[in-house]
Regions:
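Metal-cofactor-binding active-site regions of metalloenzymes
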Residues: 1-185, 194-199, 205, 209-210, ...
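Active-site glycine-centered loops adjacent to acidic/histidine catalytic or metal-binding residues
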Residues: 190
Length: 264
């Protein structure tokens, strides 16, 4: 199968970060200058997730007003059209764009406007996932999730937890997401991206319906079996995991182990 054949296949994308998926053209337009590839992408000698996350800073500068947020939503669907994506769940952290003049409601609504425009033009259906950030306080994250809950079923489809997992384990957020579960907000959690299977266990106990990455389940057959029996989906991200050195190489990637264990 050629690259062209793969591009033609209809696709569903469930783990897409808005600020990590913007085109270079969009970033250059918003910043008013040329942007080198090295400013947006890590090199092969990237050593960790923390280093990887630094590449989100520059695109994040483009998401500090309503125009930028709306255009970002449109831009990501425009790019997906080129790869024949038919449905995508796009995630972002509203609090990273909130300003004195733009509250959380306005942030979410701006992205939704751009996504709706992209949906009409490119025929790609979408769901918007709002990310709580590990370095934010529980109070801030809870305020954001309650605000986003107002848009559930009107573009927003779920919440998430993102950021430096190695520094902020899931145990610090169980109360937040147990409360998220109580208000009827579905959620996925970035867990097991940095080697801790316990973060996956804690996420499931809090009520997560999906796990982002989940690499730390390698070799934990009982945990794989439990998640398979509960029907919890795993959002696998091989390119990211290889770049952050979560796995040593393609041959170490556990997708076959997970599939053989009944995970979806």
């Amino acid at each position: 199968m050629t690259r062209e054949d793969i591009i033609k296949l209809p696709k569903v994308e469930l783990h897409c970060h808005l600020d990590g998926s913007l085109s270079r053209e969009f970033v250059e337009k918003r910043l008013g200058r040329q942007v080198g590839k090295e400013e947006l992408s890590v090199s092969n000698d990237c050593t960790s997730l923390a280093e990887y996350l630094e590449k989100f800073d520059l695109p994040g500068q483009c998401l500090q007003d309503e125009e930028g947020l709306e255009e970002a939503g449109y831009d990501v669907l425009r790019s997906m059209k080129q790869e024949n994506v038919i449905y995508s769940e796009i995630r972002f952290a509203p609090l990273l764009s909130e300003t004195d003049n733009m509250n959380c409601n306005k942030v979410i609504e701006a992205v939704l406007r751009g996504l709706e425009r992209g949906k009409k033009e490119f025929g790609i259906d979408f769901g918007l996932i709002v990310c709580a950030m590990r370095h934010h306080s529980e109070e801030m994250n809870w305020r954001m999730i309650r605000t986003a809950r107002e848009y559930l079923g009107s573009g927003v489809c779920a919440a998430d937890l993102a950021g430096a997992e190695a520094i902020y384990p899931m145990s610090e957020f169980k109360n937040l997401f147990q409360n998220t579960h109580k208000i009827g907000m579905p959620f996925t959690i970035h867990a097991g991206e940095c080697g801790s299977a316990q973060n996956i266990i804690d996420s499931v106990e809090a009520g997560a319906r999906r796990i982002g990455h989940g690499i730390a389940m390698r070799g934990h057959s009982d945990l794989i079996k439990e998640l398979a029996e509960k029907g919890i989906g795993i959002e696998m991200c091989p390119i990211s995991n290889l770049q952050t050195k979560a796995v040593a190489g393609p041959e170490k990637y556990p997708i076959r182990e997970f599939l053989n264990g009944g995970l979806k």
